Amino acid sequence: MFVTAYFAVISLLALCVGLELTARRLTPPESSAAVNPAFRRFQATFLRAYLLALWADWLQGPYLYKLYRHYSFLESQIAILYVCGLASCVLFAPFSGWLSQALGRRHMCIFFCLSYATCCLTKLSRDYFVLIVGRILGGLSTSLLTTTFESWYVHHHVEIHDFPKEWIPTTFTKAATWNHGLAVGAGLVANLLAEWLHLGPVAPFLLAVPFLACCAWFVLTDWAKEEAEKSPEGIKQTLPLGTLNGGVTHLSARARFSRSCSDGLRCMLSDKRVMLLGGVQALFESVLYIFIFLWTPVLDPHGSPLGIVFSCFMAASMVGSLLFRVATSTRYHLQPGHVLCVAVLMAFFSFFMLTFSTVPGQPRPHESFLAFLLLELACGLYFPALNFLQGRIIPEEKRASVLAWFRLPLHLLACLGLLALHGEVSGTGAGETGSGTRHMFGGCAVMMLAALMAVVSLFTLGRNDTDLKLEGSRGEGEMY
């Protein structure tokens, strides 16, 4: 597996370079946003902090499970740790947007840095309770990362700078491109620290702390300067909640939160397309959480360099994202709905393969590795296709609340899957006995079949629906 992983990462990165060059030739030129100096300065101010936060997040990916095994915890105990993180996401995600409005978006970004740094430092402890607290902080931090940074940017882009809304995807496209590269690089750096330098699986978590500190510094300085220059009334908007004006802000934010939740639920229940798309998202992404838990115990017993394997996964996802750009370009004009069907079908075949490659006593790690790469390739196709359809089907003003409702069954399904693993001894025949892992992959394959049926139902329902189709012009629903 050692040689296979290195060969795979080199091959995938070379493929990424070729696809990126092809995609650039087929993609229309940038809008006027690219040459607007004020916009570029504002974009750079945001990305400096945001990319540091993403980098710190990715550093923790390759060796989390390995760290818990290094501390001699059983797989069932590790499953509970993962469940605590997911449950924390379920509990805090609905309130993260409200807290950003009530306490201030910039303050919540600083709080993210503090909570995530504390989460990383808890990894130094072998105490199970301390690690549970760390996972709870990790779930809170993840929910903040996915909401507060983007919320700050969109608010300042539209309300403070009054830039055109059409320029927003320019920033998030650039962030997504960097995000893939950072993920690949994080796996390589984590592998360097943990295995090449023999610093152990805790080293990547400790390395993330100074990057989170740098992120907080940029938020404190650059973002504060941005707010001071562009929003002279900003001080009034961020009064402590104990003051009179702070209490008004708190009450209005709570009222907006309640109304947003009810509007999002009504939007889901009144539009069958939204319900079906939410079902696809809940099924597909809950399975991904189970994959995140299982890939290490499947591959690690066979001498796989986990950081390099993680980089392979991220490179495969990047290949999928680039293939989506090429497939939906003006030259090929493949519809995002068709790409979504292909992605779900690929994920099904991936888990179908894994049910045979993880037979207890007869593990086939190379086949499992190939199946995982196929799954990550499917993810690269899935996310931009889903973003496009969400942008077309879900009204913009209700999108955040609807997506929050989508995440609830998503995390609950993932928690149930991990709790099912907790209930039986799991293994792949490489040091552990039992067939829990194989059974879980079989369950994931069934869930992918259900997701495929939901996709087919969605496009049968909207066969002649222009909202589900990519038009010649790039509109509001275009993928980021």
UniProtKB/Swiss-Prot annotation:
Q: What is its main location?
A: membrane
A molecular-function term among this protein's GO annotations:
molybdate ion transmembrane transporter activity
Q: Which residues cross the membrane?
A: 1-21, 44-63, 78-98, 129-149, 177-197, 199-219, 274-294, 304-324, 339-359, 369-389, 401-421, 441-461
Its GO CC terms are: plasma membrane
Where in or outside the cell it occurs: the entry states: Cell membrane
Alphabetized InterPro entries for the sequence: MFS_trans_sf (IPR036259), MOT2/MFSD5 (IPR008509)
Membrane topology, as annotated, equals: Multi-pass membrane protein
For biological process, the GO terms are:
monoatomic ion transport
Please list the coiled coil stretches.
none
The protein's UniProt keywords, in alphabetical order, are: Cell membrane, Ion transport, Membrane, Transmembrane, Transmembrane helix, Transport
UniProt family annotation? Belongs to the major facilitator superfamily.
Q: Write out the function statement from the record.
A: Mediates high-affinity intracellular uptake of the rare oligo-element molybdenum.
Q: Identify this protein by name.
A: Molybdate-anion transporter
**Native species:** Takifugu rubripes (Japanese pufferfish)
